[in-house]
């Protein structure tokens, strides 16, 4: 698994720092194409999905002639649906670990890389190779169950919820938070990273951590800091 790729390439999973970069990263894929598209500029999701959100809201208003109240309600349901999805993916998919070698590698590619290299700017937001299939799945689900007229504003809300997640995730890692809400979300997420991997699964909102009683514990941080460092 950790075979040398070539004399000019870093070994799979091993830290390296690109020229001019401030933070370490690692190579995730031996295939150059997959490696390239496992990285993404943090603005890319907004460039792709903001026009989609606006287009679907425009269609809901002009073509389907939905009332403002109906559009707003469906849009809000879509945002709420994203918060549930965000929590469930983070808790039960991203933090699922199979002890086999392939299971560990899949976990590393899905989420472990972010915990090992939390400040890698190119791997903080979801790559299109992941977000587009998710978008297709949820759009199909909404359209089949609700019909196109109701699915469009709900999907627009879910897409906006996803953008809030990606934007919040990038911001708490790379920007100083001055607002009360921003400081809370940053602390919430940093506790998940550094103290309590079994809590703090919501990134854009703590709602479902409160509901499922998985708020990250400051006591675990104190316990971690109190442990004597083991000799190498």
Regions found by a protein language model. Give the residues of each.
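Short helix/loop segments within enzyme catalytic domains
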Residues: 177, 194-200
């Amino acid at each position: 698994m950790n075979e040398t790729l070539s004399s000019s390439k870093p070994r799979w999973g091993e830290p390296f720092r690109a020229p001019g970069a401030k933070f370490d990263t690692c190579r995730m894929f031996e295939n150059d194409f997959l490696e390239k598209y496992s990285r993404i500029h943090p603005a890319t999701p907004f460039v792709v999905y903001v026009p989609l959100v606006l287009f679907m809201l425009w269609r809901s208003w002009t073509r389907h002639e939905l009332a403002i109240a109906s559009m707003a309600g469906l849009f809000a349901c879509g945002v709420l649906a994203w918060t549930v999805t965000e929590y469930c993916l983070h808790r039960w998919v991203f933090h699922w670990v199979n002890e086999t070698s392939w299971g560990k590698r899949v976990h590393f590619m899905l989420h472990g890389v972010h915990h090992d290299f939390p400040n890698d700017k190119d791997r903080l937001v979801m790559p299109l190779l992941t977000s587009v299939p998710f978008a297709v799945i949820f759009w199909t689900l909404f359209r089949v169950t609700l019909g196109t007229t109701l699915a469009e504003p709900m999907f627009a809300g879910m897409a906006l919820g996803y953008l809030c997640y990606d934007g919040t995730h990038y911001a708490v890692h790379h920007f100083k938070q001055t607002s009360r809400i921003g400081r809370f979300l940053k602390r919430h997420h940093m506790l998940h990273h550094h103290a309590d991997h079994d809590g703090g699964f919501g990134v854009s909102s703590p709602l479902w951590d409160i509901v499922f009683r998985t708020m990250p514990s400051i006591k675990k941080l104190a316990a971690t800091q109190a442990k004597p460092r083991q000799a190498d």
